[in-house]
Every structure is written in C-alpha cells, then in structure tokens.
C-alpha cells in the first residue's frame, strides 16, 4: 500500500493507494500550523489509522508547500510554520517506524500526472502549474528530477525573456517577486499575472474569470489581452521546451481551466523553438486537487 499526505496550510489530506494505484481510502483533517509536536502526532495518528484500515503498513510520502533542504533534510515551508526548519522526514520516520519520503507539492503534482495510465509511456513529462504562481516538476522515466537544491521545478523564477519584452514593451514594469528578484515570469504568466497584465494595459482591475468571460463574448479589450498573454506564455514555455525537451507537458493550476490555452499554444510555440523541434503533447492535468495526494504516495514508486 502507498500512503500519500498532502500537507497544506489549512488541511492535511491522506490518501491510501493499492497495488493498482487506485485510491481506496482517504481522510482530511485541519493542519496544526503552529505546534510541531501536534503536527507530528497528527501525521502519526493518520498513518496508524490507515494501517488499521489496510491491515498492514504502507509506505509514506508527504508533499509539502515548500522545499526540503538538500543538505540537512530540514523543511522550508512558510505555509506551515510548525514545520519550518524542522527535520520532519527523520522525526516522522522514527515515530512511525518506516521510511518517509518528502518532496515539494509541485513535484508531487507532476509525478501524479506522469503515472497516469496513459501518460506513463512518455519518458519525460513536464508538469507546469499556472496558478497563483508558476512552478511544476520534471519527471524522467517515472522519477522526479530534483537537482542539487531541490529547485528544478522553480520555473516561475526565470526572468522575462527578450521576446516577451518585445511583446509587452521595453518599459513594462519589472514586478518585484517574493523570491527577492524582479521580473520573474510568474508575475506575468500566472493567474495573478494574467490579472495584473490586464490592469496594466487597461487601467481596470478584473478577476481572471470575468476577463475570460468577456473574451468568450468577443469584448475587444479582453480579446487583445488574451492574445498578448498567449504570446508571452508561448515565449516563456518555448524557452522551457528548448531547455528540457519533454515528450509531454501537463498543465495544472487555475489557468489550466482556460481551454483556449490548448488551442493556441500549438499554433504559437513553433516560432519559439529550434527548427528541428517537434511539439510535445500538451494536456490539461487529469487529477485536480487529488494530484498532490497521488504524487506524494507515488514518491515510493521512484527509485
């Protein structure tokens, strides 16, 4: 059995998956945000409850909204203050008597999609999240590529490419980013960036849902905005494809529900790729909110 924890700032969800990778049990509880001992006890109790349900001990994986430190295994996660700087992996492993694997929740998203029955045949899968920010993960032969510092999927912190500046104008503000730098692409091609860009060019604040609704009605400002956004998205994704050359791209996050993306990217991407390059397959994520739990459980499928 494979146990996967999706540990967020407000809730912890545990999913149990059988040998066929089908979810057979799950439970959700509030996250103890401030008390590390209580956080460990909560994870312990959920694990024991799953053991009782299964009649055996399953493997344990945890997806966190943050990064494990590559050198000492401590956790960096602003959303769960109780776990910040703690050796969560080692502490929980000692408490429940088995190996625990921990990874970034965006990597878990990508791993979940890569282990989809249809998608497993693709050797390299790029999971791309276009949500409040931009991130994701790279999966090669069913395994997460973490890199030296566990930051391989931090795509949102690439700077705006020169071709994007040609589209947006050289005087486009280099928006300050939470990482401490300016001009990171997540401030332009995320859901938040989608709204910011509309406000910048139209001097009007609208939520993404309303902009998209106006676009579907053919409203001129919304149409011009979406065209501009798609061009910038294609430039940024083109750089990623040239660097990583995946067979499959799976898009998640709030903007993944904008179906126009899947029609427009194949038209716009080729001009930003090498002439010999063939487009990867581009698909919408299949597992939605369940992807974090699935991917965390499947950390034990990786080598």
From Swiss-Prot:
Pathway: Cell wall biogenesis; peptidoglycan recycling. GO terms for molecular function: ATP binding; N-acetylglucosamine kinase activity; zinc ion binding. It catalyses: N-acetyl-D-glucosamine + ATP = N-acetyl-D-glucosamine 6-phosphate + ADP + H(+). Transmembrane segments: none annotated. Keywords: ATP-binding, Carbohydrate metabolism, Kinase, Metal-binding, Nucleotide-binding, Transferase, Zinc. Zn(2+) binds at residues 157, 177, 179, 184. PROSITE patterns: ROK. GO terms for biological process: N-acetylglucosamine metabolic process; peptidoglycan turnover. It is an enzyme of class 2 (transferase). This is N-acetyl-D-glucosamine kinase. It comes from Yersinia enterocolitica serotype O:8 / biotype 1B (strain NCTC 13174 / 8081). The lineage of its organism: Bacteria, Pseudomonadati, Pseudomonadota, Gammaproteobacteria, Enterobacterales.
């Amino acid at each position: 059995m494979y146990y996967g924890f999706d540990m967020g700032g407000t809730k912890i969800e545990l999913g149990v998956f059988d040998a066929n990778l089908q979810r057979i049990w799950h439970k959700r509880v509030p996250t103890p945000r401030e008390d590390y001992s209580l956080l460990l006890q909560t994870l312990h109790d959920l694990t024991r409850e799953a053991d009782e349900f299964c009649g055996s001990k399953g493997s344990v994986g945890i997806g966190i909204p943050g990064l494990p430190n590559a050198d000492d295994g401590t956790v960096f996660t602003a959303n769960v203050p109780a776990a910040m700087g703690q050796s969560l992996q080692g502490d929980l492993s000692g408490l429940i008597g088995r190996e625990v694997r921990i990874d970034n929740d965006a990597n878990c998203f990508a791993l979940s999609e890569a282990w989809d029955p249809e998608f497993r045949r693709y050797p390299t899968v790029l999971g791309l999240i276009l949500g409040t920010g931009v991130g994701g993960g790279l999966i090669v032969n069913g395994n997460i590529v973490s890199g030296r510092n566990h930051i391989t999927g931090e795509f949102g912190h690439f700077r705006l490419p020169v071709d994007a500046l040609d589209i947006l104008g050289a005087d486009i503000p280099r928006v300050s980013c939470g990482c401490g730098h300016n001009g990171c692409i997540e401030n332009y091609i995320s859901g938040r960036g989608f709204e910011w860009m509309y406000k910048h060019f139209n001097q009007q604040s609208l939520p993404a849902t309303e902009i998209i609704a106006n676009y579907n009605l053919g409203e001129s400002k919304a149409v011009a905005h979406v065209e501009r956004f798609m061009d910038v998205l294609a430039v940024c994704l083109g750089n990623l494809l040239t660097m990583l050359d995946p067979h499959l791209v799976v898009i998640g996050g709030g903007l993944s529900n904008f179906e126009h993306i899947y029609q427009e990217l194949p038209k716009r991407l080729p001009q930003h790729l090498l002439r010999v390059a063939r487009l990867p397959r581009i698909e919408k994520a299949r597992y939605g909110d369940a992807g974090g739990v699935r991917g965390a459980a499947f950390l034990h499928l990786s080598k």
